[in-house]
Amino acid sequence: MDVNPTLLFLKVPAQNAISTTFPYTGDPPYSHGTGTGYTMDTVNRTHQYSERGRWTTNTETGAPQLNPIDGPLPEDNEPSGYAQTDCVLEAMAFLEESHPGIFETSCLETMEVVQQTRVDKLTQGRQTYDWTLNRNQPAATALANTIEVFRSNGLTANESGRLIDFLKDVMESMNKEEMEITTHFQRKRRVRDNMTKKMVTQRTIGKRKQRLNKRSYLIRALTLNTMTKDAERGKLKRRAIATPGMQIRGFVYFVETLARSICEKLEQSGLPVGGNEKKAKLANVVRKMMTNSQDTEISFTITGDNTKWNENQNPRMFLAMITYITRNQPEWFRNVLSIAPIMFSNKMARLGKGYMFESKSMKIRTQIPAEMLASIDLKYFNDSTRKKIEKIRPLLIDGTASLSPGMMMGMFNMLSTVLGVSILNLGQKRHTKTTYWWDGLQSSDDFALIVNAPNHEGIQAGVNRFYRTCKLLGINMSKKKSYINRTGTFEFTSFFYRYGFVANFSMELPSFGVSGINESADMSIGVTVIKNNMINNDLGPATAQMALQLFIKDYRYTYRCHRGDTQIQTRRSFEIKKLWEQTHSKAGLLVSDGGPNLYNIRNLHIPEVCLKWELMDEDYQGRLCNPLNPFVNHKDIESVNNAVIMPAHGPAKNMEYDAVATTHSWIPKRNRSILNTSQRGILEDEQMYQKCCNLFEKFFPSSSYRRPVGISSMVEAMVSRARIDARIDFESGRIKKEEFTEIMKICSTIEELRRQK
């Protein structure tokens, strides 16, 4: 039957239909090829916004640097990065005055974190620029390589396992005259394959020592590698994002810890909270403005958009902020926190892979690496690329571009939020000393501004003053993209507010469907997503029931597990029909074994195995959940697993789902082809790390331990823990004397081996 789509909306208030206009169904666009062009765009734009600043040369690396701070006051409307130090410091002072003790308290909290954080904090995170190999690696591998190189160069403070000591090594390394590193290279040779008698290319991995002088090492330590941001919806053009190396990461982490601590105490900050908590926080600010705008005042809200937030921020400004925030703190703490902004003021952007050329007539392709862009003849490039390269050439050193102004995407989200909130804080009547006043919300580069005044002229004056104040702090509110409404209707971080937040359900659309982990996890995640959306996103019962039916259908097609009594023929139907016929209680079969679906919107919280357990034949139960069955996954299955859910917007969310270990919880094996590449050593390293970490977790189940503070290695911590546990178990009679003696003997042997090593 044909449904007239307008009928769907007859009962729906217009603002609730906002979701239907979002570009969130279907696959998001991905980037292909090189990100070099996007990176050059970023570098060139950033310099253009600060072009009237002062040029200097870095004495260590020889890199030309542009400093726009305290530069000429900006022209109206043009985005610019000329932040004025005294204005930023004054905004900080007023922020502190409105929140007495906020900086002091946050510093104390951060100091505690700094002293307790272990170096393994840096293994979190995805791709990281590995300066030893000059390319991206998984974070854990990049950290291991860095520590290995440090050790072979006589830097061993990091062996304490504390992050702060690793950072001491980083500081030391920058003073060394040279650093020796091990690099990998590939040898290719043509050999005849014994089986097929064809010629094949064999790759072998060689390692060689390489010495980096101080200048080359500094350039690498200050390098941010760049990639193209994938899966951005609603944009025509791609853009570049940066991934910093291990030298920078630790320092950034501490700065962000301090800024996060401050943001938690600011009612206008949309970070670090999320979800319903964030909505509640924001609703409070709106409520305050609406209740305070008495009958004599009118209230308007700007849904704000800033032009090129990152490219106009400046690390030197962040340094000024940190210097102010930590002004009464111990010297060592101030030094640790000021290093990140100093490194960012001297950062280099790696231009990525370079360009690929192909000649149609000669059928050959050749790669022009970024290192060659400084010297290659420009006649091979089209006009726009030629302009980019000409512009960037004065900034190039060894395939990286000097990029002093600007902050690449996502590096100092918390600290830049503090800067934004400090302007919102200036809107109180006692600061504006006029009839208008403002407040608002800030989350990284996104903001909403609420202005109250007796009349429209006052509103206009307030907005103008806000706009100009922003300019003085290097923030450029876009007049084209921001829009103003009566307070009560606005959008902030993709939350739509209309006398309360409306659910923007389309944002969640990408997370519906079959995840593709395995039959067990997929069923569990699928129903959990539906359940969560009923709780958080206004997914009504009828729609949820429909979503569930669609999900089951999708699931059956994905895993070819149509019901045993269906006519649909697939590769699995023969086995499934056989099982169906043999089974006495057919309702007990899992959907993935051709059983019926027993889910409805009332029982989504129950794992399928539990839901059907009482209905199952006994021998089916035995096969399904028997730990001796080789197909039941033997990895310790936590009762709760985490799935990473990608909403259409914002960061990936961690979602918990219940996991029951059955024959369906298999884990696919790694692709073989990786084992023949240079990545193989890395894989082995990763597995070794994994094993060590798993072992450590066994000794210290997360419920029972506070991280070992103080200086002990993982092995020492585990041995001492084993001894304590053994003694307790022996004294309470849980283990026999022989077992106790054996454990003690093993512990002593381990310590002995460590001493000999």
Curated annotation (Swiss-Prot):
InterPro entries: RNA-dir_pol_NSvirus, RNA_pol_PB1_influenza. It comes from the Viruses. Residues 53-82 are annotated as: Disordered. It is an enzyme of class 2 (transferase). Residues 286-483 form the RdRp catalytic domain. It is found in: Host nucleus; Host cytoplasm. Residues 249-256 are annotated as: Promoter-binding site. Phosphorylated by host PRKCA. Residues 55-64 have a biased composition (Polar residues). A motif (Nuclear localization signal) lies at residues 187-195, 203-216. Changing F251A: 20% loss of RNA synthesis in vitro. One of its GO terms (cellular component) is host cell cytoplasm. Belongs to the influenza viruses polymerase PB1 family. RNA-dependent RNA polymerase which is responsible for replication and transcription of virus RNA segments. The transcription of viral mRNAs occurs by a unique mechanism called cap-snatching. 5' methylated caps of cellular mRNAs are cleaved after 10-13 nucleotides by PA. In turn, these short capped RNAs are used as primers by PB1 for transcription of viral mRNAs. During virus replication, PB1 initiates RNA synthesis and copy vRNA into complementary RNA (cRNA) which in turn serves as a template for the production of more vRNAs. This is RNA-directed RNA polymerase catalytic subunit. It comes from Influenza A virus (strain A/Wilson-Smith/1933 H1N1).
